[in-house]
């Protein structure tokens, strides 16, 4: 399930666009996640009160959390699949503290791909989308494996 060097290059090139505005991209990803899958909002006590897209866009806390999420993911993607330590740490917090099901990682992966394509259509074509999809699937599979080790049925 690994990615070729060329696929990793596509992933990292696309991620370079994210790094120009991590917080803005992160906020858009979370808005897409929460509006597309409102049940995910229930896992975030800090954001449960945000009912509309306008409220979400106005939330500095949501923007900060989006920055945190995409900064962590960027660090993982840059490891090109050699992310065992990072995934272990992330899985521990997401299983034990936050109780985030693997399905929600699928939802946010879809949101990331949607936002990247919407914001950067000329730099995020079918090849880049496919590579990013594979990279995010690798991440999710490794998170799921770590969840199993931790005994989390997420």
UniProtKB/Swiss-Prot annotation:
One of its GO terms (cellular component) is extracellular exosome. Belongs to the globin family. Monomeric heme protein which primary function is to store oxygen and facilitate its diffusion within muscle tissues. Reversibly binds oxygen through a pentacoordinated heme iron and enables its timely and efficient release as needed during periods of heightened demand. Depending on the oxidative conditions of tissues and cells, and in addition to its ability to bind oxygen, it also has a nitrite reductase activity whereby it regulates the production of bioactive nitric oxide. The modification Phosphoserine is found at residue 4. PANTHER family: MYOGLOBIN. The modification Phosphothreonine is found at residue 68. Monomeric. Residues 2-148 form the Globin domain. Its EC number is 1.7.-.-, 1.11.1.-. One of its GO terms (molecular function) is nitrite reductase activity. It holds the Pfam family Globin. It is found in: Cytoplasm, Sarcoplasm. This is Myoglobin. Coiled coil: none annotated. GO terms for biological process: removal of superoxide radicals. The keyword Iron applies. O2 binds at residue 65. Heme b binds at residue 94. Nitrite binds at residue 65. It catalyses: Fe(III)-heme b-[protein] + nitric oxide + H2O = Fe(II)-heme b-[protein] + nitrite + 2 H(+); H2O2 + AH2 = A + 2 H2O. The gene is MB. Keywords: Cytoplasm, Heme, Iron, Metal-binding, Muscle protein, Oxidoreductase, Oxygen transport, Phosphoprotein, Transport.
